[in-house]
Amino acid sequence: MKRLPLPLQPSTFLQVLRSARTLGLSLLEPVDYASRVINNKRRLPPVHLRREVGDLSSFESSGGEFMAYCKLLASVHPGERVLDIGCGCGLMALFFEDYLDTTGRYVGVDIQSRFVRWCRKHISSRSPNFKFIHLDLPSQRYNPRGNAKADFCIPEEDHTFDFIFAKSVFTHLLPKHVERYIAEISRLLSEDGRCLASIFLFTGGRTEVTGTQNHLSFEYGNDTCRYQSEHIPETAVAYSESYIRRILSHHNLVLQEPIRYGTWSGRANGLSFQDLMVITR
């Protein structure tokens, strides 16, 4: 009797799908490169890397939007020391490269090694005050073979950074990694430092995050965190606001008011899509 093939695990299926998409996008590389040259955008990462961090059509506009938040909400200055957690393929690094002066410093951290390699080759090579670190943290969605321990440390000295940025990082983390990143933010933030982070927050029960008015629905999980996908939770994660406040307080951090709630939950007057938090000591 012929054996039926075993079904693919969700994480394996995702890797196969990703590889196929990357192959397809790689066929567009010559056209994309020509377009970047013609439009004087050679600094942009290639199309297959840009697609990994979001919608191709909004890659640059998203960076511009969040650069404005960095200035307006967290008062970042050109001479400051900046840590970008989840730097991806260098979206915000490109904006900070234009903004920071020679006394400023930028460190980007990401769990995907191909992003870090590209940023080192194309950004650090021309801007020596820009450094990129690969943090091999396991993630079922983004780095399934990662082997960093749960008590990982970002290899930088205590109280090093004036500004820490975490765009769409907590939205893809499970609780143990959220708590560890917050501990690292507390360790690395200077006395007068600020952190700007985007997140999905809920204050009520299950109906708040599964309602029909929501642009995202978090059907799975518990009262602390809820997931959009049962099989690959890191696809999108929402957290109880009280839980986040408690973890911040435990690490001697303060969530500045007001939280700028986003439109993801159906709010018509949200500042951005995700909720925005400014964190200080």
Q: What are the functions of these language-model segments?
A:
Residues 3-73, 78, 89-96, 107-153, ...:
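Class I (Rossmann-like) S-adenosyl-L-methionine-dependent methyltransferase catalytic domain
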Residues 174-175:
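Helix-capping/helix-break motifs at membrane-protein junctions
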